[in-house]
Amino acid sequence: MSDGTGEVVCKTCPRHCRLANGAIGFCRARRAEGCRVVAANYGKISSIALDPIEKKPIAFFHSGSNVLSVGSYGCNLRCPFCQNDGISQHGGDEVQCRTATPAELADLAARFKDEQGNIGLAYTYNEPLVGWEFVRDSAKAIRKRGMLNVLVSNGCASEEVIAELAPFIDAANIDLKGPSQDYYDWVGGDFKAVCRTIALLHEAGCHVEVTTLVVPGRNDSDADIDAISAFIASVSPDIPLHVTRFFPRWRMTDASPTPVATVRRLADIARRRLSRVLVGNC
């Protein structure tokens, strides 16, 4: 959408990047072309693997099955602890990719259905919503083959993008990284947008699970996890929450891992409001 200045405004996420023709957005994955913004990473596959669905992590949806998992490049957040910075924090000229169409991915997913128990396609590894058009088109192709779609996302997207995708997403794990906008200022996101995504997907009938990575000194207080679990419970107390342990990565290699006792304590606090709380990386 043009803003009348010769620039185009990207409406994929709350950042609303203003882009001159040919410019790339903050996410490194969207580009201005004339009066519109397109996914520069459309069909660009950096990573592909057949994973147990529990690895997403999704614990209460087709447990014991596998899901063909694909990623591209780019992300609209800058979490200093990113575990996939090799693809999420780099652009298309820095990430080695192969090209695939939605139909080709759907055919590959179907091939693994009988041989290896594959239930469908998971959009993951980088932030899939910065290339939401490819997610939408692939999800439609998967549905035509009678298979399922799984989204693993930071959830920081516009209401319009979520509304476009929700009818085709069967299960999702959304990161709720912290309890407030103050935390999201640190990682470069929008707290209310993430909360809205969780609520919208749940309202659409999608199976939703949530992950919170516990970072020492940032979101590891009792009040932090209580606020996170209170919001989730306001949507549904039955939404599973994964409380996971931080390990030093990317720009936080000098930090210490979260003590296991801290993760377990916070999980116990979350269980006061939520019926299904799991610990991860412990």
What are these regions (language model features)?
Residues 1-25, 217-282:
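Auxiliary Fe-S-binding modules of radical SAM enzymes
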Residues 88-89, 125-130, 155-162, 171-188, ...:
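Conserved radical SAM core fold
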Residues 32-171:
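Conserved Radical SAM active-site core
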Residues 104-107, 133-144, 160, 164-167, ...:
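Alpha-helical scaffolding segments of alpha/beta enzyme cores, especially the outer helices
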Residues 86-88, 94-96, 186-190, 255-256:
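Short glycine-enriched, charge-decorated loop/helix-capping segments at active-site entrances
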Residues 110-141, 182-195, 212-227, 231-233:
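Conserved glycine-rich "GG(E/T)P / GGGxP" loop and the immediately following alpha-helix
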Residues 12, 16, 26-29, 74, ...:
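Short, cysteine/histidine-rich loop/knuckle motifs that typically chelate Zn2+
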